[in-house]
């Protein structure tokens, strides 16, 4: 029915042809779908939903397939609905700092589209060059800047969603009643198909600097995270890496990470020049016990320091093509103990 209703180029069938869609970034679990459909417009999405409903076929929505939770993994005999071709930036409202997007727009493409207006989109997952905004909403993605600027849920103003019946719903932050907009964020495609996203944009900061601090122990590095927050600083980005991650990222990206460090902390500060300098003075005092301290001296150097961290996932993939990666949530007060325990288990 799908082949009859839609032109051949957007329906993929056959075991070998659908292999690329049998998993997302969580590659330890795999399941081939019955077929994959790559619609080119919303009407085709509605057609697919109608046909699948009539035939009682499960539908699994897919963005770019970079997620790490298995959210885009097909069910047995399911139809994968890939939305990568719906990739238009529909409108940009500079005055109100909003952008209306189709779900297949890549995360990094949002900031590229509004850069000329001095704006950008804050959430920046490590897969931002490939991941889609629809997938970001489905996974409630974060990124290195989520500490200060929030997750996807904090940066989405409205959604247009299709139910399995093909009904179109508009969910907005301005709606009264139940928080359905927030509910859709992180729902992994289970509650509806996201066909349009309105995101908020923020002004590019006057200045941004990254402090790179190397430590002789994971515990000292983890304690530094808590100390920075305790000092009243909310960094634009705050990320730590252990020795294995440092070696993997440096081998892949070659950005100048110190390979003799047991742990590395990247702390980004942004704002006006005066704000950044004041916060930088405080952070450097907090990090005075680090074995190495370096502050980015240019925008290119700042981006390079983050490039290494954002390369960690593909870097480890180069060492082991099949590995298990999940996000964990650890209270800051337990971070040092948890990381030391993980290192102990790794040695075993």
Label each region the model flagged.
Residues 51, 153, 257-261:
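Acidic/histidine-enriched ion/cofactor-binding microenvironments in catalytic or ligand-binding pockets
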Residues 14, 62, 82-84, 124, ...:
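Generic beta-strand/beta-sheet core signal
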Residues 1-50, 67-97, 126, 243-254, ...:
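N-terminal flexible segment immediately upstream of the FAD-binding catalytic core
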Residues 1, 38, 42-45, 103, ...:
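Generic structural signal for well-ordered, non-membrane alpha-helical segments
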Residues 31-59, 98, 192, 198, ...:
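Soluble FAD-dependent oxygen oxidases
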Residues 13-19, 203, 209-348:
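C-terminal substrate-recognition/cap domain of FAD-linked oxidoreductases
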Residues 88-241:
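FAD-binding subdomain of flavoenzyme oxidoreductases
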